[in-house]
Structure formats: C-alpha cells, structure tokens
C-alpha cells in the first residue's frame, strides 16, 4: 500500500470514531503544526503522522469509560498504545515503524520527556494546540463533557494554568516562536474575561 493509502485509511478511521465530532479537527491542525515545527529537521514524517492522528483516540466517547469516577483516573495514553498497533496494521502502515509511533504517543503530553525527534516535534505541537484562540476554544468546548471542570471559573483556571506552565515546556525554537502570538491572544482573552465578569463569572 502506498504512503497516501495508509494515511487516508488512518484519517478515515479517526473521522469515523471522533466523538464529539469537533474533536476531529485537533488531528489535522496538529499535523500541520508538526510540519511547521519540523521544517529543516531530520525525522520520520510517517511516524509523526500516525502518532498525531491516533494519539487522542482514548478521549473519544465510545473509547473512553462512561462512568464519571472511572473517567477521572482514565489513562487514555495506555489505551491508545494498546489499540494503535492493530489499527496501523489494518491500515497497512509499515510494521517496522509502529514502535516509533508508540513512543511518540507515550510521550506526547506536556509532563512527559520525549527522547526522539519525532516525539519532541509532536509534543511541542500538542502544547501549541493548548494555547491561543484554538486553546481557548478547545478548553471551553470541554465544559459539561469533561470531569476536570464544569464551570466557567474552572475553565478560566485551566486557561491561566496553560498560560503559566505550557510555554516553558516547549523545546524547539520554531515552536517557541509560533507560541508568541498564541500566548498574547490567550492572555488578552483571560484579562478580558476577568474584567467583564468580575466576581460573577461562575
């Protein structure tokens, strides 16, 4: 199977399983960011592509637990690393590259320590997706459907934490440059929200 064929198969799988539907957009945006971040670097783009398209499968409704208490301790990364090999084999993805894909998925979160170039690129891209207008949109979209917060105040606290901690986690200089306008946009939004709502945000 050609490169284009297994990529299309992976995209189709995620398009079919993305629930809520708005979660689908994270994958193509994330991959586009990896291409910007990775420009001039030597890395396996197939590995990055497969990892960024599959990395959040475990947060989709239908893949994550329904019970709220179980969801609070749900390890979506462990779920994906278990499921991804069979999905990739079904898509005729090169089997020799699957371990590298799993390594990217295992270390894609801000608190993780990536050890490969592919993982570092993907992790930086995922951090950027949590900043700026997109980061705001994704955070607010979780209200009422995520166990981490249910009120606007809790969402505001999440945005404040993202602003404070995430930019410091970026490793690649291109990522840091791309973060500058995103940080400014998010900071402006947070300040406006605090000003407009005052003590009555709820």
Language-model features, listed with the residues they occupy:
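Short alpha-helical hairpin
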Residues: 1-12, 52-58
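His-Asp-centered metal-binding catalytic motifs of divalent-metal-dependent phosphohydrolases/nucleases
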Residues: 45-65, 80, 102-110
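Inter-helical turn/loop segments and adjacent helix faces that build the functional surface
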Residues: 91-95
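Divalent metal-dependent phosphate-bond-processing catalytic cores, especially two-metal-ion Mg2+/Mn2+ enzymes
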Residues: 5, 16-43, 54, 110-202
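Membrane-helix interface segments
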Residues: 44-45, 97
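An active-site-proximal "capping" alpha-helix that borders the catalytic cofactor pocket
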Residues: 30, 74-89
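Short glycine-enriched, charge-decorated loop/helix-capping segments at active-site entrances
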Residues: 65-71
């Amino acid at each position: 199977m050609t490169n284009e064929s297994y990529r299309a198969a992976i995209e189709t799988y995620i398009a079919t399983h993305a629930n809520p539907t708005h979660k689908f957009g994270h994958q193509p945006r994330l991959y586009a960011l990896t291409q910007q971040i990775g420009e001039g670097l030597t890395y396996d783009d197939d590995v990055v592509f497969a990892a960024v398209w599959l990395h959040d499968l475990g947060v989709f409704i239908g893949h994550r637990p329904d019970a709220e208490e179980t969801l609070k301790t749900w390890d979506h990364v462990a779920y994906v690393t278990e499921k991804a090999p069979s999905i990739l084999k079904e898509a005729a993805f090169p089997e020799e590259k699957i371990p590298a894909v799993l390594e990217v998925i295992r270390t894609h979160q801000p608190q993780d320590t990536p050890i490969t170039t592919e993982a570092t690129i993907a992790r930086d891209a995922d951090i950027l997706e949590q900043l700026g207008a997109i980061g705001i949109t994704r955070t607010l979209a979780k209200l009422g459907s995520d166990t981490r917060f249910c009120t606007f105040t809790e969402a505001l606290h999440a945005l404040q934490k993202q602003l404070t901690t995430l930019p410091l986690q970026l490793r690649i200089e291109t990522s840091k440059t791309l973060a500058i306008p995103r940080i400014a946009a998010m900071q402006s939004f947070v300040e406006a929200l605090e000003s407009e709502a005052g003590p009555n945000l709820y």
